[in-house]
C-alpha cells in the first residue's frame, strides 16, 4: 500500500471509530428522549432506563456487525473460548479489579491533601451511587434488581460490542493491534467521563481490548467485563437494597473479602496475560503449520494427478 493510501486508510479508520462512538452516544440520547416524552422519571426508574439504553445499543451494534461482515465471516470475532482461556480470563478479571481498588485507594489518599481531588472523589462516589439523588423508598424493588442485573450482565455486552467489537474492529483496518488497543481504550475512558473514572477506565480498556485481540473472541472481553462488574459493583448494589434487609456489617465484610481477593490476584493476572500471549503465538504457529501441510497435500495431490494423466497418455500411445 502506497503512502497516500496508508494515510487515507488510517484517517478512514479513525473517522469510522468516532462514528461508532457517536452512535453509542446518540442511542443514549434517543432513549433519554423516549423516557422524557412518556414522562418517566429516569432517577426513579434508573434500572429500566439503563436496561433500555443497553438493549438499544446492542441492537445498534448488531446492525453495525451485519453491515461490516463479509460473507460468512462476522465483523466481530466470536471464537469459542477454551477452558484454559476461561481460567486465565477469570484471573485477569480479578487482577483488573484489584488494580482499580488500588487506583481508588491512591486517589483517596491524594484527596486528603488536594482539594480539587477531594471534590472529584465526591463527584465520583455520587456518580456510582444508585441512590445518590433518589430515596430508596420511592424506587420499586423490581427496578433496583433490574439495575443490578443490567449492570452485571447487559452492560458488558453493550459496551464490549461497541468499544471492542466496533471501535477496535474499525481501527484494526488502519492500524496495528497495539495502536488499535490504545486508541479504543482512550475512547472507552473518555466516554466514561473526564474525572476519576477516566484513569481506570482507560487502563481497563487496554486490558479488555488486549484480551479480545489475544483470544480473537469478543466473549473474552465480555466475560472479563461481567466478572469485573459483578464483583466491583453488582454484589454491593444488590446487598444494599434496603428491602432485602441485609445488615451493613455483612455487606462490608463481603466487600472487604472481595477486595483482598482481587489484590491477591494481581500478580497472577500478569502471569495469566503472559499465558494468553504465549497461547496466541502457539495457535498462530499451529495454524501456519496446518496451512503449510494443507498446501503441501494439495501440491502432492496435483502432482499425483499429473503423473497419472501422463502415464495414461503414455499407455494410450503404446496401444
Feature-to-residue mapping (PLM):
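Juxtamembrane helix-loop-helix connectors linking adjacent transmembrane helices
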Residues: 45, 74-155, 310, 314-319
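Membrane-interface helix/loop boundary segments of multi-pass membrane proteins
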Residues: 158-183, 210-217
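Alpha-helical transmembrane segments in multi-pass membrane proteins
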Residues: 24-69
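Hydrophobic core of alpha-helical transmembrane segments in multi-pass integral membrane proteins
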Residues: 21-29, 54-63, 93-100, 260-281
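Hydrophobic alpha-helical transmembrane segments
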Residues: 14-18, 47, 86-91, 145, ...
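Functionally important transmembrane alpha-helices
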Residues: 30, 185, 189-190, 197-254
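Interfacial transmembrane-helix boundary/kink motif in multi-pass membrane proteins
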Residues: 2-23, 71-109, 113, 253-264, ...
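C-terminal membrane module of polytopic membrane proteins
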Residues: 226-319
